[in-house]
């Protein structure tokens, strides 16, 4: 899996509400979270399927 999958999720610092997904390295699963619209890192996906394909072993 790519190294960015190990990053903690980042909600960002703006005021938007975008439903997103991140990979949780401890449970080896993807979870939903609310992204603010800016200040992201690479461990953010638009769909749970994209997260699973990229990060779940």
Curated annotation (Swiss-Prot):
Expressed by the venom gland. The record marks 15-16 as: Reactive bond for chymotrypsin. One of its GO terms (molecular function) is serine-type endopeptidase inhibitor activity. Belongs to the venom Kunitz-type family. InterPro entries: Kunitz_BPTI (IPR002223), Kunitz_BPTI_sf (IPR036880), Prtase_inh_Kunz-CS (IPR020901), TFPI/VKTCI-like (IPR050098). It comes from Naja naja (Indian cobra). It is found in: Secreted. One of its GO terms (cellular component) is extracellular space. Disulfide bonds join 5-55, 14-38, 30-51. Its main location: secreted. This is Kunitz-type serine protease inhibitor. Residues 5-55 form the BPTI/Kunitz inhibitor domain. PANTHER family: BPTI_KUNITZ INHIBITOR DOMAIN-CONTAINING PROTEIN, KUNITZ-TYPE PROTEASE INHIBITOR-RELATED. Keywords: Disulfide bond, Protease inhibitor, Secreted, Serine protease inhibitor. Serine protease inhibitor that inhibits chymotrypsin. Also interacts with vasopressin V2 receptor (V2R/AVPR2). Inhibits vasopressin binding human V2R in the nanomolar range (Ki=7.87 nM), and also moderately inhibits vasopressin-induced cAMP production (IC(50)=208 nM). In vivo, intraperitoneal injection of this protein into rats increases diuresis by 1.6-fold, without any loss of electrolytes.
């Amino acid at each position: 899996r790519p190294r960015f999958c190990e990053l903690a999720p980042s909600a960002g610092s703006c005021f938007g509400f975008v439903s997103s997904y991140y990979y949780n390295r401890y449970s080896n699963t993807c979870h939903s979270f609310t992204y603010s619209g800016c200040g992201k890192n690479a461990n953010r996906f638009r769909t749970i399927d994209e997260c699973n394909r990229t990060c779940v072993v």
